[in-house]
């Protein structure tokens, strides 16, 4: 999981919740 810079088709981290979730990153 990547936090800020997400490669094409990569994932981004969501530290907003108790358990960090990974969401798809991209257009």
UniProtKB/Swiss-Prot annotation:
Keyword set includes Disulfide bond: yes
Keyword annotations: Amidation, Cleavage on pair of basic residues, Disulfide bond, Hormone
Disulfide bonds: 1-6
Functional summary from the UniProt entry: Vasotocin is an antidiuretic hormone.
Residue numbers carrying Glycine amide: 9
Name by which UniProt lists this protein: Vasotocin-neurophysin VT
Pfam families: Hormone_4 (PF00220)
Annotated TM spans: none
Molecular function (Gene Ontology), one example: neurohypophyseal hormone activity
Keyword field contains Disulfide bond: yes
Cellular component annotations (GO), alphabetically ordered: extracellular region
Organism (species): Sclerophrys regularis (Common African toad)
Top-level lineage group: Eukaryota
Protein family per UniProt: Belongs to the vasopressin/oxytocin family.
